[in-house]
Amino acid sequence: MSQEFDYIIVGAGSAGNTLATRLTEDAGVTVLLLEAGGPDYRFDFRTQMPAALAFPLQGRRYNWAYETDPEPYMDGRRMECGRGKGLGGSSLINGMCYIRGNAMDFDGWAELPGLEDWTYLDCLPYFRKAETRDIGPNDYHGGDGPVSVATPKAGNNPLFHAMVEAGVQAGYPRTEDLNGYQQEGFGPMDRSVTKNGRRSSTARGYLDQAKKRPNLTIVTHALTDRVLFDGKRAVGVTYLVGDSEERVEARARKEVIVSSGAIASPQLLQRSGVGPRALLESLDIPVVHDLPGVGENLQDHLELYLQYACTQPVSLYPSLLWWNQPAIGAEWLFNGTGIGASNQFEAGGFIRTRPEFKWPNIQYHFLPVAINYNGSNGVKEHGFQAHMGSMRSPARGRIQAKSKDPRQHPSILFNYMSTEQDWQEFRDGIRLTREIMAQPALDPYRGREISPGAHVQTDEELDKFIREHAETAFHPSCSCKMGTDDMAVVDGEGRVHGMKGLRVVDASIMPLIITGNLNATTIMIAEKISDKIRGRKPLPRSTAKYYVAGDAPVKGKPMREVKQG
């Protein structure tokens, strides 16, 4: 059985759905969109209710549930590496934090050969094109894009405001918009949530526009086996449907576009014969093209939580108690309001820990409850926590296919905490977080430090806590990087070096990880490259101003000094 389309897109995630929607705006263009997972069931509260964000990570229906190899600098821990499965990809299971990265990230990309048109001002029009912000557009934000973005509102949890004030009292800037003129500092955090309180995945935002178009064919439960080649040209794919072992073939007249994410995209290329020769030969995979960078340069964000007891009954602890959950669910289901309608990450911040960092190297998410991100180990009392993580670790990992079998997960190694900079940033980060948490704004709420605990003070004690408790922020990227050097996989338009009719478009093509959550930037990348594929002129460069710290001090004098070990 064979079918023919102009474009085949492998992966209906944040990038794939964006591409499928934009390419099929041209009525004469046919697109096949393949997704290994199932539909984004709209009546499943686990993916649709923002406050239920921990649930999809606990099962396998919506989560690939990858695990790393034993991480050598983390006491040999096998670390969780959840990725979204189903229409929407990781936008179906992520934390819905709408953060774009720092302007300097993109200006840094644009300094690399071949990526000159990836400056922040080149990218900003595509961020705006993708977005509808609930309080309206401005120079930084869009008003009629597919991604619904909600801003924190008056009357939300008082802990959000106290934590932002504490950051300012500790000597850091205040910012009104982490995606606007100035990322650096503390302020309210936007989220990818609709005005009706539903998750704004790319399945909802993009595919809802496109799925009824006659020129778009969507196949779910379709696991792509490999890309087919005629010489160095990609001409199609084979895929498996459900549990079947029968391979279905589809042909691409123009291009095969791999949008399977930073774990699966390099794995698919390797299984198809595009990758490091030695690896392919060791797996008995015929080499179509020796491309050593496929699966290399893997990057992620690591984070940990500092948890505190809350002395006033204002945290979300009661919402964890089963007898309170039916009322929360009913208010969300029928009104789209209440605790269920927010991811509860409504405040955050970005800071520099040392003067040598030209832009922030630490991100904060504040949460008005003490619990693990995946919903486990909830503290049995009122509490709150700060998620703290480093943004641009020098650590580099890799993805390697283990066999030709598309159902076998690849070997994943991030090499977390493999450099001295990593340890320095996390030690600094914990100590600076404690200083923030000790400021007067939190006096009405702050109880004892639950985790790590006030007794954990020395470098050695902090390092032990980091090794045992740091977790992924679920931001794998950069494993098929853009560029022109020997380890680059694609050019600045996502075209695979040395091949024809083959692109990669997703978070794997970032050359360097960004400062913040990845989803908004992944969508922007797909918006930008879709114009290239369609032969359209790029959107005019923005003229918006943006903050550069320059010689500004890392922080001012804190209102309350804290002595630490």
Curated annotation (Swiss-Prot):
Pathway in which the depicted protein is active: Amine and polyamine biosynthesis; betaine biosynthesis via choline pathway; betaine aldehyde from choline (cytochrome c reductase route): step 1/1
Signal peptide stretch: none
InterPro entries: BetA, FAD/NAD-bd_sf, GMC_OxRdtase, GMC_OxRdtase_N, GMC_OxRtase_C
GO biological process, one term: glycine betaine biosynthetic process from choline
Top-level taxonomic group: Bacteria
Transmembrane stretches, start-end: none
Residues bound to FAD: 6-35
Active-site residue list: H475
EC assignment: 1.1.99.1, 1.2.1.8
Keywords: FAD, Flavoprotein, NAD, Oxidoreductase
Pfam family, one: GMC_oxred_C
A GO cellular component entry from the record: membrane
Enzyme class: oxidoreductase
Catalytic reactions of this protein: choline + A = betaine aldehyde + AH2; betaine aldehyde + NAD(+) + H2O = glycine betaine + NADH + 2 H(+)
GO molecular function terms listed in the Swiss-Prot or TrEMBL record: betaine-aldehyde dehydrogenase (NAD+) activity; choline dehydrogenase activity; flavin adenine dinucleotide binding
Cofactor(s) it depends on: FAD
Entries under NCBIfam families matching the protein: betA, PRK02106.1
Function: Involved in the biosynthesis of the osmoprotectant glycine betaine. Catalyzes the oxidation of choline to betaine aldehyde and betaine aldehyde to glycine betaine at the same rate.
Entry's family note: Belongs to the GMC oxidoreductase family.
Protein name from the UniProt record: Oxygen-dependent choline dehydrogenase
Organism for this UniProt entry: Pseudomonas putida (strain ATCC 700007 / DSM 6899 / JCM 31910 / BCRC 17059 / LMG 24140 / F1)
